[in-house]
Amino acid sequence: MTYDVVPAFGGRARLDTAFTVALREVVARVPGARGAVFLDGDGEAVDEFAEVPTTEIRILGAHLGILVSLVKEHAGQLGEPLELVIETDRATLLVLVLDDRYLVALEAGPEAQLGVMRRELERAATALRREMR
């Protein structure tokens, strides 16, 4: 895993990991994307990249982690959830389950195309899984 120090939102320096790079790339490749967050199974942010303050994407990630946990708990005979999509009049949220311990989520404006979000978040998920080994 490589590390670089780069300016974060608000001008403060932060340590840039391979996880950050994957998240930054997905945000850059999806028109309208606002941020992406890599989460553990409890909804705690492992890493994030956002065009908005990172606190917002971390809080959103925590809430999405809780939703995925609830879906897993109540899915029963339907099987394990693979993704969660929430569309509102102001945002589209996509969460992919990476494995039994990790998730990745992408937030975008309503203009973002879900198919593009899914394709690019899958690319990021592949990079994240590779780095997790």
Feature roles, as predicted:
Residues M1-R133:
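Non-catalytic interaction/Regulatory regions outside core domains
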